[in-house]
């Protein structure tokens, strides 16, 4: 039986904007109030996803969230018609309106944590949506995320969907952005690496001083329990608090893994050598490649600006690994030099492919942010909603859909335009028909 690691990319929503909502994310803050292009952003994302499908990889798409989120605005006291709710929020609480208009669900690395059937006791693929409690604009996503995941992976024989963790900072969970999996083959049992920023219940444990640690050890342990993982298939690693304070808000900004390769920065973790030894021990003597990037070659700021580690490492059909990198990596002298050297070092990584995802990058999300990885066998892949899998037909339909419904430009002041509600809902209603998702949105209930 064939085994794959499918990437499910987030489709950029119609309200993609630069509101600077993500404290701790340097790119997000630096581009606050810039004019965005929802149409360009969506097309850049689709182009990247289609390119991976054309490389022979399993590739799907996840639908965006409904924005503006009038349901949340009504929950916090704004009343009247939809237009009146929007108008009141714009005048009385513009920051809350911006939070309720974010298209941040496009970064599906934060949508959920996924454990494949090879690792779980019941032999099913487990999904737990991330609660994302650290950021208001993302904390309103999990319920709809769960709906979309259930409509995409819609066969209970193969897929087990959990509710998101309790909505409290002690269980702060940011999903797959703080999780990676090492294995010899996608279909073999692997080691799941859970990276956390702090221990919520231990006030004496190290934690960052400037920026928040969004993932807790307690959340990571809860996910491992829910997903029926045993101790031998789980490793819990603390991210270096110092790099969080330098803008490394998720682990996928400082490390990335694929099969038997862990690619990480020298400063990424606490107790690095001890944890690498634990991984090696649990890998039972099979070949592992730890690729450590020294600070002397790539500093933390260059890593963050270029998103060197927010790249995707994929295994091509010929068995070689390739890095899927943003063009920003080409534009950074130190990073570009390192990547050119990397492919000559005798590791499994032999190629680098560059993609323009600047609309996403300016909001603080690179190629790895845009995808949720799901390792599966051919039977499980066949059980996925076929209308969510990338091919020529879906690519063309979604591009036409974007062209029809998305604005070329969107300024922050445009978020108060009632017409944006109509445009967004019309687009999403049509999208649920294209992808055959059913009624996953609040306005469709």
Curated annotation (Swiss-Prot):
Its EC number is 3.5.3.23. Pfam families: AstB (PF04996). One of its GO terms (biological process) is arginine catabolic process to succinate. The active site is at residues 174, 250, 369. InterPro entries: AstB_sf, SuccinylArg_d-Hdrlase_AstB. Catalyzes the hydrolysis of N(2)-succinylarginine into N(2)-succinylornithine, ammonia and CO(2). PANTHER family: N-SUCCINYLARGININE DIHYDROLASE. HAMAP family: AstB. This is N-succinylarginine dihydrolase. The lineage of its organism: Bacteria, Pseudomonadati, Pseudomonadota, Gammaproteobacteria, Alteromonadales.
